[in-house]
Amino acid sequence: MNIPKDPVMLVSFLNLKLRDQYASLNALCDDLELNPEEITQKTASIDYHYKPEYNQFL
């Protein structure tokens, strides 16, 4: 799946998917065939980190 390359847009995309469709980052990555380590590196570049207790990047 094509996902946004811009980190800000990526966080918005991920949080929307996590809120509406997926119970966890791993479920999202498994379904969309994404590497969770790559995702978290990209979001960390703008100081957003996955918080499992909220199921969001904050």
Segments (PLM) and residue ranges:
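Short acidic, Pro/Gly- and aromatic-enriched capping/linker segments at domain boundaries
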Residues: 35-48
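N-terminal acidic leader/helix
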Residues: 1-20, 24
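Short alpha-helical "recognition helix" segments of helix-turn-helix
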Residues: 28-29
